[in-house]
């Protein structure tokens, strides 16, 4: 048993920012993470972080606000978006003060590149250059900068501790219970405030850009605690994942001048989006690519991908602005970008939905049609859904989301509590269900391997709830996923030990993934409209009445 003023679950960009924000304010803070902090998935973000700094041309946060609301397909929470875009320039300056090595222009300002869906003057002033970047490794720099910063403070890190469940009492959150992967010990971390920053659940799909650790642990913990999730059916497909490997090729490539071509050598985006062309918003590009592939204007023996061409760009531009991409393409596709195009395919990239919060990061539940704050529980980052992204996220808004809302969680805890406040007691047997579940899985002796069941789930999500969705296929998907969820009882685990039992951890992650997959596909089936990333072929129109009541 441990006792803290606050505990943060997850140590990616949002988790670290929340944790050292709390420590800075004098709170005795714990940060539990199943990975070493710099292994978190934030490290894989490539493109950049949006802020209306106006280094490349005149810019205004209100224009960024407009683009984000429009980009969310009018589902985003405008208070939260207002807060995020207004805070953006200060957040980027703060990062630079922490020592983040941004790419710069010749006169020493932060370099900003063009990204999809970004405009000037409320959509009337043409393409905006708003995405501050560190070549094509922005997330890597961000995470290492934040981690370096967090070491100045006295935060207690529980590294390689897998959070099992929230400790809830009388509708309040009193902390978390976690498994230490290193020695198999169980830790109850009691705290007055708990922040969930566990990232997304991209691994519910077969082809995705997320790390194998993006298993929606926080989302599932909240579900098990009987709290609602929001907008899980909105899943962003990134237009350019490497064919076969799923590795991400940043939108920055198209921001620097790369183009998509079909098997006739035609730059097909000119047909679908005459103005923005290859920098249209991500759902538009993904759907256009899918249509080209369906209609047979695609490459490969199975005619199932298109090409991203960069070799018309000068080699020195590729070397300075996109060094990591040249390397990634070589390793995962065997392609030399200066001579040949990269095979790409739309790939699951980001979860817009998650744990519902307000712009202060407080988790909400829905009681009699009203939002109600869950005492002691906060969420930020990809796990949360303050809904700054609505139905589809704009590129380079996610790193901004991490830093702004990680900080917001720390600030709102500091507003409502002070360091050293008494931690409310918990029942002596709190968390015993989690331990029972753990033991049950450790000795599980059924007929299906974890990996087999996981693969069936990923394949069925990929085929039933992809870029285009139809009612009949979604219903079939709901039945299939429900059936697979039932098969969790028949799992077989092989490692009975307690030390570094990865078999057990993967099985726990599968339980979490299943809960996310179930809610996602049922949500998609129930949302009878097309909006943002959720494109229904049988309901092609957006239903604006949905904006006003919970579907």
UniProtKB/Swiss-Prot annotation:
Binding site for FAD: 11, 14, 33-34, 40, 42, 47, 163, 217, 382, 398-399
Predominant location category: mitochondrion
The EC number(s) this enzyme carries: 1.3.5.1, 1.1.5.-
Record's keyword terms, sorted: Acetylation, Electron transport, FAD, Flavoprotein, Membrane, Mitochondrion, Mitochondrion inner membrane, Oxidoreductase, Phosphoprotein, Transport, Tricarboxylic acid cycle, Tumor suppressor
Modified residues annotated as Tele-8alpha-FAD histidine in this record: 41
GO cellular component, one term: mitochondrial inner membrane
Alphabetized SUPFAM superfamilies for the sequence: FAD/NAD(P)-binding domain, Succinate dehydrogenase/fumarate reductase flavoprotein C-terminal domain, Succinate dehydrogenase/fumarate reductase flavoprotein, catalytic domain
Complexes and interactors: Component of complex II composed of four subunits: the flavoprotein (FP) SDHA, iron-sulfur protein (IP) SDHB, and a cytochrome b560 composed of SDHC and SDHD. Interacts with SDHAF2/SDH5; interaction is required for FAD attachment. Interacts with TRAP1. Interacts with LACC1.
Family under the similarity heading: Belongs to the FAD-dependent oxidoreductase 2 family. FRD/SDH subfamily.
Record protein name field: Succinate dehydrogenase [ubiquinone] flavoprotein subunit, mitochondrial
Organism: Mesocricetus auratus
Classification of source organism: Eukaryota, Metazoa, Chordata, Craniata, Vertebrata
């Amino acid at each position: 048993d441990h006792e803290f003023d606050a505990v943060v679950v997850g140590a990616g960009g949002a988790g670290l920012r929340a944790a050292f924000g709390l420590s800075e304010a004098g709170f005795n803070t714990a940060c539990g993470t199943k990975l070493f902090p710099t292994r978190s998935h934030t490290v894989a973000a490539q493109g950049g972080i949006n802020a209306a700094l106006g280094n490349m041309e005149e810019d205004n946060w209100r224009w960024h606000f407009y683009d984000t609301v429009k980009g969310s397909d009018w589902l985003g929470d405008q208070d939260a978006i207002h807060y995020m875009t207004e805070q953006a320039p200060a957040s980027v300056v703060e990062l630079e003060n922490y020592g983040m090595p941004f790419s710069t222009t010749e006169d020493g300002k932060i370099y900003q590149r063009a990204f999809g869906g970004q405009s000037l003057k409320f959509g009337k002033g043409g393409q905006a250059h708003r995405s501050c970047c560190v070549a094509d490794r922005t997330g890597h720099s961000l995470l290492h900068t934040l981690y370096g910063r967090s070491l100045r403070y006295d935060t207690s890190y529980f590294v390689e501790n897998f959070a099992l469940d929230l400790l809830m009492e009388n509708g309040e959150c009193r902390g978390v219970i976690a498994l230490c992967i290193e020695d198999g010990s169980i830790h109850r971390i009691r705290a007055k405030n708990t922040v969930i920053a566990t990232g997304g659940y991209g691994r519910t799909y077969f082809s995705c850009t997320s790390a194998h650790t993006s298993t929606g642990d926080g989302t599932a913990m909240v579900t098990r605690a009987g709290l609602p999730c929001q907008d899980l059916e909105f899943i962003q497909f990134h237009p350019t994942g490497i064919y076969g490997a799923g590795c991400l090729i940043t939108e920055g490539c198209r921001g620097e001048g790369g183009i998509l071509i079909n098997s006739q050598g035609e730059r097909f985006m000119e047909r679908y989006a005459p103005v923005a062309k290859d920098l249209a918003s991500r759902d538009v590009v993904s759907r256009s690519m899918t249509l080209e592939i369906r209609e047979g204007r695609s490459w490969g023996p199975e005619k199932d991908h298109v090409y991203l061409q960069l070799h018309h760009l000068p080699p020195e531009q590729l070397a300075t602005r996109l060094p990591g991409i040249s390397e990634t393409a070589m390793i995962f596709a065997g392609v030399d970008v200066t001579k040949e195009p990269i095979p790409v395919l739309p790939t699951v990239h980001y979860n817009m939905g998650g744990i519902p919060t307000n712009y202060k990061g407080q988790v909400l539940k829905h009681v009699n049609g009203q939002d109600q704050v869950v005492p002691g529980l906060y969420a930020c980052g990809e796990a949360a859904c303050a809904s700054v992204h609505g139905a589809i996220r704009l590129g380079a808004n996610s790193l901004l989301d991490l830093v702004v809302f990680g900080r917001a969680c720390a600030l709102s805890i500091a507003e409502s509590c002070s360091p050293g406040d008494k931690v409310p007691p918990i029942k002596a047997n709190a968390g015993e269900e989690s331990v029972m579940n753990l033991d049950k899985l450790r000795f599980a002796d059924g007929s299906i391997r974890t990996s087999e069941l996981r693969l069936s789930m990923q394949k069925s999500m990929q085929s039933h709830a992809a870029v285009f969705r139809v009612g009949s296929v979604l219903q079939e998907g709901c039945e299939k996923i429900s059936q697979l969820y039932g098969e969790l009882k028949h799992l077989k685990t092989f490692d009975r030990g307690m030390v570094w039992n990865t078999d057990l951890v993967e099985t726990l992650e599968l339980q979490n993934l299943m809960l996310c997959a179930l809610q996602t596909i049922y949500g998609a089936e129930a949302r009878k409209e097309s909006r943002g990333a959720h494109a229904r072929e049988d309901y092609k129109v957006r239903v604006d009445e949905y904006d006003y009541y919970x579907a």
